[in-house]
């Protein structure tokens, strides 16, 4: 429970302009923010940019953040939305990247076959699968994070899992 109290104190301090509290928030949430972005976009450099942009957006809007709520889900929402936007923009571009030859290191707890299968999903399906099965959010939490109806989240989870089953051995 101490971590929650520390986080609330860091948020209060950051809202008051404390650079050290802002740094503590950043250090605490950077790994999961980067991981969430990476698992959606599958590009280490883009994931870093997305996570940094999400933190900057969070900092700019920290005065509107409700300190009674946990910071992590709020930040993950920003990260995932930006990652989806990036993935959509990338897929709209006609350029095809041969990333497999120079693929970045995968998170150790996710096998390369799973990462490859996730790559084949649409950004929308990939985001809900990552939030649910790799970051541990419930469907209700995902619906709130992404501002989607619960039925849409459930549908994307089911379709995404069905597609993963078809592609995984």
Predicted regions and their residues:
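Amphipathic, Lys/Arg- and hydrophobic-enriched alpha-helical face
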Residues: 26-44, 61, 118, 167
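C-terminal edge and immediately downstream basic/flexible tail or linker adjoining helix-turn-helix-like DNA-binding
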Residues: 2-3, 13, 42, 99, ...
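Arg/Lys-rich amphipathic alpha helix in sigma70-family domain 2
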Residues: 60-67, 77-97
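DNA-recognition helix of helix-turn-helix
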Residues: 73, 80, 84, 134, ...
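A short pre-motif secondary-structure segment
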Residues: 128-132
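Structural recognition of an alpha-helix C-terminal capping motif at a helix-to-coil junction
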Residues: 49-56, 60, 69-81, 155
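A short, charge-rich alpha-helical start-of-domain segment used by transcription regulators
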Residues: 11-35, 59, 126
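Internal acidic/polar
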Residues: 3-7, 85, 91-118, 138
């Amino acid at each position: 429970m101490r971590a929650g109290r520390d986080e609330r104190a860091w948020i209060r301090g950051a809202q008051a302009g404390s650079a050290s509290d802002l740094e503590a928030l950043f250090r605490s949430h950077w790994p999961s923010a980067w991981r969430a972005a990476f698992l959606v976009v599958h590009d280490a450099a883009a994931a870093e940019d997305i996570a940094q942009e999400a933190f900057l957006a969070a900092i700019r809007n920290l005065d509107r953040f409700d300190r009674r709520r946990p910071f992590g889900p709020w930040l993950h929402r920003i990260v995932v939305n930006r990652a989806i936007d990036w993935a959509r923009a990338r897929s709209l571009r006609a350029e095809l990247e041969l990333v497999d030859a120079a693929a970045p290191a995968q998170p150790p707890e996710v096998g390369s076959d799973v990462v490859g299968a996730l790559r084949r999903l649409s950004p929308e399906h990939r985001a809900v699968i990552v939030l649910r099965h790799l970051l541990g959010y419930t469907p209700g939490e995902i619906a709130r994070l992404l501002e989607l109806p619960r039925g849409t989240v459930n549908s994307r989870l089911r379709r995404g899992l069905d597609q993963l089953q078809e592609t995984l051995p």
